[in-house]
């Protein structure tokens, strides 16, 4: 997919001015140049052009709010003066895996006064003697080179990202967590109500069982009384019969 079409798809019916992040990794650039990216992206803070076949950044539009630029795995060998001209507020630049051979090719980056982090992994320039010392001397505004400061202390994760973009993502994550907490609270309330309903139903069932047992007990007592009465009547009948038989014998 070419770069122009990819940009159109990434817009998703938004205006360029509404876009803060734009990822165009692995798309195709014609003639090794940036295409379809215009100065209308005035609020863009993060731009990623990894492995798009770039040879030059000469077509880069002016992006006054851009803080982080990913240009790794391309074929850029020079012409970095355009970065200072077009990206005055750039703080993070990744040029890893490009065709940069000499320290002198990095000299235009001196004009990027806000530049805080620079990555040059897998560039030939990193094989030079005193590479790190030379780059830090050339670019005194740098805090981190290839993820480490002048004292070889590793950069914390927060310094490897754009602050503004990270804050927005953290806010969104916080809102998602709050929503999940609210849902969990509602589920707990529903569970408690269900437990109460079950307890009430259980009490009602116990009452019904008790009433049935009482009724059953009364029925048994009534049956016992009826049997006793029948036995008494039967005994009286036998007694009368004996008396009658005795009178007949006397006659």
Curated annotation (Swiss-Prot):
Residues 149-233 have a biased composition (Acidic residues). SUPFAM superfamilies: L domain-like (SSF52058). LRR repeats lie at residues 16-40, 43-64, 65-84, 89-110. Belongs to the ANP32 family. GO terms for molecular function: histone binding; RNA polymerase binding. Keywords: Acetylation, Chaperone, Cytoplasm, Host-virus interaction, Leucine-rich repeat, Nucleus, Phosphoprotein, Repeat. This is Acidic leucine-rich nuclear phosphoprotein 32 family member B. InterPro entries: AN32, Leu-rich_rpt, LRR_dom_sf, U2A'_phosphoprotein32A_C. Residues 123-161 form the LRRCT domain. Interacts with histones H3 and H4. Interacts with KLF5; this interaction induces promoter region-specific histone incorporation and inhibition of histone acetylation by ANP32B. (Microbial infection) Interacts with Sendai virus protein M. PANTHER family: ACIDIC LEUCINE-RICH NUCLEAR PHOSPHOPROTEIN 32 (PTHR11375), ACIDIC LEUCINE-RICH NUCLEAR PHOSPHOPROTEIN 32 FAMILY MEMBER B (PTHR11375:SF2). Residues 234-244 have a biased composition (Basic and acidic residues). The modification Phosphoserine is found at residue 158. The gene is ANP32B. Some glutamate residues are glycylated by TTLL8. This modification occurs exclusively on glutamate residues and results in a glycine chain on the gamma-carboxyl group. Directly cleaved by caspase-3/CASP3. The keyword Ribonucleoprotein does not apply. Histone binding is mediated by the concave surface of the LRR region. One of its GO terms (cellular component) is nucleoplasm. Multifunctional protein that is involved in the regulation of many processes including cell proliferation, apoptosis, cell cycle progression or transcription. Regulates the proliferation of neuronal stem cells, differentiation of leukemic cells and progression from G1 to S phase of the cell cycle. As negative regulator of caspase-3-dependent apoptosis, may act as an antagonist of ANP32A in regulating tissue homeostasis. Exhibits histone chaperone properties, able to recruit histones to certain promoters, thus regulating the transcription of specific genes. (Microbial infection) Plays an essential role in influenza A and B viral genome replication. Also plays a role in foamy virus mRNA export from the nucleus to the cytoplasm. Disulfide bonds: none annotated. GO terms for biological process: inner ear development; negative regulation of apoptotic process; negative regulation of cell differentiation; nucleosome assembly; positive regulation of protein export from nucleus; regulation of apoptotic process; roof of mouth development; vasculature development. It holds the Pfam family LRR_9. It comes from Homo sapiens (Human).
